[in-house]
Design a protein with these regions (language model features):
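N-terminal pre-domains immediately preceding structured catalytic cores
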Residues: 5, 10-221
């Protein structure tokens, strides 16, 4: 179903010359039975995501290989790179500037409905439990994509959320949050070992800017 949706959107791009075309929402055919049950009983209201942050296929102006992930923290977007200078763009929640992480990592682990064990730093700043089981109430949401460097967990993740109303804002403790529907979609696409590039704030290297982003990240060349 997801492949068919992408094919239709790409056809629309070619016929209409469009740069930006909205994708259809995630089909439940991509959800497990557990996904359907937990999302149907989620303890939060369904958010009205602004059009600018809804999933779309867009032109892509960097040189990362298809299958890579690039996060533009300034614009609050995550890109999953496709062939032919295209990418799937998702609206995300990013970390507050003092807490945000940037750099190059790899996907070192993937989990469905992950549990959450807050880091010592988070526990110093926030009144949170020591451990939260996976589920719709969990801040990690429906999926966790764990970022590793040199085979070591960075403690930063791309994951779902139980606060979808904050998509497009910078309020997290450093991790990249997505709607649960979008993180399920990304999780099903991204492979273990895939490159993840999180751009530094104000780097001027946005994937949507063809004037400054054509070279990609030099550390990947």
């Amino acid at each position: 179903m997801a492949g068919r949706g992408i094919a239709l959107v790409l056809a629309g791009l070619l016929l209409g010359g469009c740069v930006h075309t909205q994708l259809e929402p995630s089909s439940e055919s991509n959800f497990t039975q557990r996904d359907k049950k937990l999302l149907a009983n989620a303890p939060y209201a369904k958010a009205n995501i602004p059009t600018a942050y809804q999933r779309a296929i867009v032109q892509y102006h960097r040189k990362e290989a298809p299958g890579s992930i690039v996060v533009d923290t300034d614009a609050r977007y995550l890109y999953y790179v496709l062939p032919d200078n295209r990418a799937i763009r998702y609206g995300v929640i990013v970390g507050e500037e003092a807490l945000s992480w940037y750099g190059i990592a790899k996907v070192g682990r993937k989990e469905e409905w992950p549990s959450w064990t807050p880091t010592a730093d988070i526990k110093r700043r926030l009144d949170v439990p020591n451990f939260v089981e996976g589920g719709a109430h969990n801040p990690m949401g429906a999926r966790g994509i764990y970022l590793y460097q040199a085979n070591k967990d960075t403690l930063f993740r791309i994951h779902g959320t139980n606060q979808p109303e904050y998509i497009g804002q910078a309020i997290s403790s450093g991790c990249i949050r997505m709607t649960n529907e979008d993180v399920i979609d990304l999780f099903n696409r991204v492979k273990m070992g895939s490159i993840v590039v999180v751009l530094a704030p104000r780097s001027g290297d946005s994937p949507s800017n063809p004037q400054v982003a054509t070279a990609g990240d030099p550390r990947l060349n």
